Amino acid sequence: MIQMQTVLDVADNSGARKVQCIKVLGGSKRRYASVGDVIKVAVKEAAPRGKVKKGDVFDAVVVRTAQGVRRPDGSKIKFDGNAAVILNTKLEPIGTRIFGPVTRELRNDKFMKIVSLAPEVL
């Protein structure tokens, strides 16, 4: 469960290390985002020679949450932390590699590029 001001790890090689959620997209009253939701983020920590700089604002898709995601069969998948993948204006990933596992729910939300780049899909 991601809300405004939540700090997330970045699960790609775009150059950002930490991002902060500044808006949950999808309606004016929407408070929380889960796996597969698109959020607006600001880069808080970045690598020296990355594609993004500290202070830049991007869209990002949430790929892992500590809250977890409930499956229709009743199982629940939780992660140790919250992570996102930074997207460009066309909602395509900026990075060329994805680090760590991602959930199968991303496949339903038209993020097949992220699913195909990920080392493990749970």
UniProtKB/Swiss-Prot annotation:
Q: List GO molecular-function terms, semicolon-separated.
A: large ribosomal subunit rRNA binding; structural constituent of ribosome
Cross-referenced InterPro entries:
Ribosomal_uL14, Ribosomal_uL14_bac-type, Ribosomal_uL14_CS, Ribosomal_uL14_sf
What domain of life does the UniProt record list for this protein's source?
Bacteria
GO cellular component labels? cytosolic large ribosomal subunit
Biological process GO terms, please? translation
Report keywords, A-Z. Answer: Ribonucleoprotein, Ribosomal protein, RNA-binding, rRNA-binding
Q: Which Pfam families match?
A: Ribosomal_L14
Family matches, as NCBIfam families: rplN_bact
| Complex formation | Part of the 50S ribosomal subunit. Forms a cluster with proteins L3 and L19. In the 70S ribosome, L14 and L19 interact and together make contacts with the 16S rRNA in bridges B5 and B8.
Q: What does this protein do?
A: Binds to 23S rRNA. Forms part of two intersubunit bridges in the 70S ribosome.
Family, similarity comment: Belongs to the universal ribosomal protein uL14 family.
**Protein name per the record:** Large ribosomal subunit protein uL14
